[in-house]
């Protein structure tokens, strides 16, 4: 019978679904294992990146089931967001209709690939029964003081007409549409992620070994902890003070001017009445609209403008001019910098440009620096000079002493600063979860009552082509009653950042379908944390950091007793075409549906898993998918062409008594060795490619010995056992093929429900081994010897080999290198 993948795959997908083979329940006596791939945005069609990601997860899920684990492997849809809204505008339809149609199509595509999902747990974040709980979390976070509203400079995408978090601005461009991001002052809702900065940083240690070092480093750097001091500088002739954060309080006596960010709240007060108003305002407007990455680049030309105001150095008493500078950022530290040009490179460059004074206050050992001769700032260690009572101290000691003085004299304090900023979750778009607050003239900002949730997104709306949200123009939505006083009020028309939905979906999977609470306490405790999370490294900062924060916040609200959501993380590589990322605009997209129709799902899965280790990128190639197809057909023919009347054998079930000849001994040893290697490669390193390669070698050996082994009953037992092991090992990778062939072998049970084969250590031992013999590093002979032959005997046998004798004739043997069981190398000259 010819291999017909479409018919076979449809058959077994139906059987698995009918028998609920992948249903999971908490409370089993088996150990639990929760494997999860990052859920997709329902764009309409899956791509090869999806196939690779989900195939990796499916192999892990199926393998763990075979190992005896109670496996949770769910799937859902990250369904809110700007792309759906923009697509709906483009196609003149509603985002909900567009989204749910795409979900239906993508679900069908995923089912065609035979992934072992528990589809009963499917969720879509745009479903009100999902985001009602998110709105409840919002209210709980408000009670905890973890959510607040403030007016602040925000990243604004003029094309998307919405605010972006700092993490969503890539090289000064919107992460979704690549438009140049502008700065606007807007009132927004923020999650106080900075309250967890220290815990987020410290708990990275718990993830060491389970997460890639690269991701841990990225999060460590993004959180960006700095230890230093906050110092207050009084504004001359005013009651105002400017606070600065510095990691170098030892250099405060060398501060000769102040630099503040264009966004600093004191700018207007400082310039009023100085005659500098127009100059400063023009500079501020220009710099605020600059690319944020450009403003932080080392190559940025330092620019500034004098405000006309001065401040007083609290230690030296120096009257220092205050400049607005392009390299100072409002979101880092306090938005103000005490400039120490002799000991900071940016300040040095700025001071030279604007002819500002320098004071050397740290002298290196064995040298004497002077401002006139310095060509660059000195940022190293040394002895403090020109620093009043602190002169003569090593500068590291001076840091502590000056910080103590500042605290004692009410001029500052020791403090820790973080690069991490609070998370802006307000979005001025329609297709998102409504923020559950109202604005009342009498009561102010009032949270919606929990019993009134969900605040539903109105579906009877018309999206706007200009990108503006229709919620602010839908009275049926925004007109409401104040939950506190009952008077007329206005509902918030911003929606939540879609990263909020993806920050807790993995927890909801444990209790999907529970309409009484966001989580079933027992199910949550049983399943979390996720044992293996799989997704792209591009989510290292955004999604993964937000999810870590969200779990800690939910913990502190009493929802769970958990510190970290994902015990282990695998960041898979991309699928490329000719070295470039696949994209429709480049015309280099490979359609998975077309490949499945041509080759079958198992072949597509096999190629994606065999092409490269999972963490590395790989190039799609027609020859590669053809090679995978040949191997699948080769396995099919191996079983199809077995001798008639063979009884079904369990994997690794033949005995040493069945091995009456060399071929049987060799196949039995190879079978057990392959089971050991493939299991270890999948279990320990997710090296599916090497596991598949090992099975391929066993299949090749079976083709060479099939006729010989099929000649007698004992040989057929060895053959049947090895073939069954091949199918069991390939079952997580090519499940439909293996299930069909398993049935053809006469087995009454389903391969999906069987355990992973168990190898026998004794079966791994060989009676004889083949030893390669080299002369001066070149292979000259191979000899078959009893296993365990010692060094002296191997040397003697090697030197007696005819081809070795011929290649050492007339030479003197200088050395014989022997590795028992492995190789012999004769060194002669």
UniProtKB/Swiss-Prot annotation:
Its EC number is 6.1.1.4. ATP binds at residue 584. A motif ('KMSKS' region) lies at residues 581-585. Keywords: Aminoacyl-tRNA synthetase, ATP-binding, Cytoplasm, Ligase, Nucleotide-binding, Protein biosynthesis. Gene3D superfamilies: 3.10.20.590, HUPs, Isoleucyl-tRNA Synthetase, Domain 1. It comes from the Bacteria. It is found in: Cytoplasm. The keyword Ribosomal protein does not apply. One of its GO terms (cellular component) is cytosol. GO terms for biological process: leucyl-tRNA aminoacylation. Disulfide bonds: none annotated. It holds the Pfam family tRNA-synt_1g. PROSITE patterns: AA_TRNA_LIGASE_I. InterPro entries: aa-tRNA-synth_I_CS, aa-tRNA-synth_Ia, Leu-tRNA-ligase, Leu_tRNA-synth_edit, M/V/L/I-tRNA-synth_anticd-bd, Methionyl/Leucyl_tRNA_Synth, Rossmann-like_a/b/a_fold, tRNAsynth_Ia_anticodon-bd. A motif ('HIGH' region) lies at residues 40-50. Its main location: cytoplasm. Belongs to the class-I aminoacyl-tRNA synthetase family. PANTHER family: LEUCINE--TRNA LIGASE, MITOCHONDRIAL, LEUCYL-TRNA SYNTHETASE. This is Leucine--tRNA ligase. The gene is leuS.
């Amino acid at each position: 019978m010819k291999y017909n993948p479409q018919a076979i795959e449809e058959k077994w997908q139906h059987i698995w679904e009918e028998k609920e083979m992948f249903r999971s329940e908490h409370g089993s006596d088996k150990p639990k294992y929760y494997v999860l791939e990052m859920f997709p945005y329902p764009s309409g069609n899956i791509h090869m990146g999806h196939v690779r990601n989900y195939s990796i997860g499916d192999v892990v899920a199926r393998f763990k089931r075979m190992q005896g684990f109670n496996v949770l492997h769910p799937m859902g849809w990250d369904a809110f967001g700007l792309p759906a809204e923009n697509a709906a505008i483009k196609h003149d339809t509603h985002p909900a209709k567009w989204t749910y149609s795409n979900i239906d199509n993508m679900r069908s595509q995923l089912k065609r690939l035979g992934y072992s999902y528990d589809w009963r747990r499917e969720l879509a974040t745009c479903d009100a029964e999902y985001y009602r709980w998110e709105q409840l979390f919002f209210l709980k976070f408000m009670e905890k003081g973890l959510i607040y509203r403030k007016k602040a400079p925000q990243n604004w995408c003029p094309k998307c007409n919405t605010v972006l978090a700092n993490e969503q601005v890539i090289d000064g461009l919107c992460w979704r549409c690549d438009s140049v991001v502008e700065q606007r002052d807007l009132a927004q809702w923020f999650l106080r992620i900075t309250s967890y900065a220290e815990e987020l940083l410290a708990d990275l240690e718990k993830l060491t070994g389970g997460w890639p070092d690269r991701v841990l480093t990225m999060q460590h750097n993004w959180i960006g902890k700095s230890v230093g001091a906050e110092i207050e500088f009084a504004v001359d002739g005013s009651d105002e003070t400017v606070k600065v954060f510095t990691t170098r309080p030892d250099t405060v006596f060398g501060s000769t001017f102040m630099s503040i960010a264009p966004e600093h709240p004191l700018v207007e007060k400082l310039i009023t009445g100085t005659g500098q108003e127009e100059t400063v305002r023009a500079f501020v407007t220009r710099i605020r609209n600059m690319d944020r990455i450009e403003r932080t680049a080392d190559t940025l030309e330092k620019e500034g403008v004098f405000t006309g105001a001065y401040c007083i150095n609290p230690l030296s008493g120096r009257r220092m001019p205050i400049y607005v500078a392009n390299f100072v950022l409002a979101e880092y530290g306090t938005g103000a910098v005490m400039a120490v040009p002799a000991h900071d490179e940016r300040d040095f460059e700025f001071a030279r440009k604007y002819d500002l004074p320098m004071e050397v206050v740290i002298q290196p050992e064995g040298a004497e620096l002077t401002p006139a001769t310095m060509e660059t700032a000195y940022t190293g260690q040394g002895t403090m000079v020109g620093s009043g009572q602190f002169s003569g101290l090593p500068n590291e000691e001076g840091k502590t002493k000056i910080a103590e003085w500042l605290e004692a004299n009410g001029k500052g304090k020791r403090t820790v600063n973080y690069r991490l900023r609070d998370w802006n979750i307000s979005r001025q778009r329609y297709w998102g979860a409504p923020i559950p607050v109202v604005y009342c003239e009498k009561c102010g900002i009032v949270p919606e009552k929990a019993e009134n949730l969900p605040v539903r997104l109105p579906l009877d709306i018309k999206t706007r082509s200009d990108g503006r949200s229709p919620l602010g123009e839908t009275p049926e939505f925004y007109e409401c009653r104040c939950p506190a006083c009952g008077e007329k009020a206005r509902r918030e028309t911003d929606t939540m950042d879609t990263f909020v939905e993806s920050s807790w979906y993995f927890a909801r999977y444990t209790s999907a379908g529970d309409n009484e609470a966001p989580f079933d306490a027992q199910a949550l405790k049983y399943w979390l944390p996720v044992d293996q999370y799989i997704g792209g490294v591009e989510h290292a900062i955004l999604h993964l950091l937000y999810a870590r924060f969200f779990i800690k916040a939910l913990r502190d609200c009493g929802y769970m007793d958990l510190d970290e959501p994902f015990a282990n993380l695998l960041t898979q590589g991309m699928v490329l075409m000719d070295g470039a990322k696949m994209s429709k605009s480049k015309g280099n997209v490979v359609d998975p549906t077309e490949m499945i129709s041509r080759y079958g799902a198992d072949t597509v899965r096999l190629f994606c898993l065999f092409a490269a280790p999972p963490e590395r990128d790989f190039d799609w190639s027609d020859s590669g998918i053809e090679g995978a197809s040949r191997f699948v057909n080769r396995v099919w023919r191996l079983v199809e062409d077995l001798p008639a009347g063979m009884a079904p054998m369990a994997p690794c079930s033949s005995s040493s008594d069945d091995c009456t000849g060399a071929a049987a001994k060799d196949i039995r040893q190879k079978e057990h060795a392959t089971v050991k290697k493939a299991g270890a490669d999948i279990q320990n390193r997710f090296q599916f490619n090497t596991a598949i390669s090992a099975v391929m070698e066993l299949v090749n050996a079976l083709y060479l010995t099939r006729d010989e082994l099929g000649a007698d009953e004992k040989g057929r037992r060895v053959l049947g056992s090895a073939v069954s092991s091949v199918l069991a090992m390939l079952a997580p990778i090519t499940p439909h093929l293996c299930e069909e062939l398993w049935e053809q072998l006469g087995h009454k049970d389903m391969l999906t429900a069987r355990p992973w084969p168990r190898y026998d250590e004794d079966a791994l031992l060989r009676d004889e081994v083949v030893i390669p013999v080299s002369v001066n590093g070149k292979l000259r002979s191979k000899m078959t010897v009893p296993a365990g032959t010692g060094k002296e005997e191997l040397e003697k046998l090697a030197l007696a080999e005819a081809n070795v004798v011929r290649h050492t004739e007339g030479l003197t043997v200088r050395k014989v290198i022997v590795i028992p069981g492995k190789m012999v190398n004769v060194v002669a000259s």
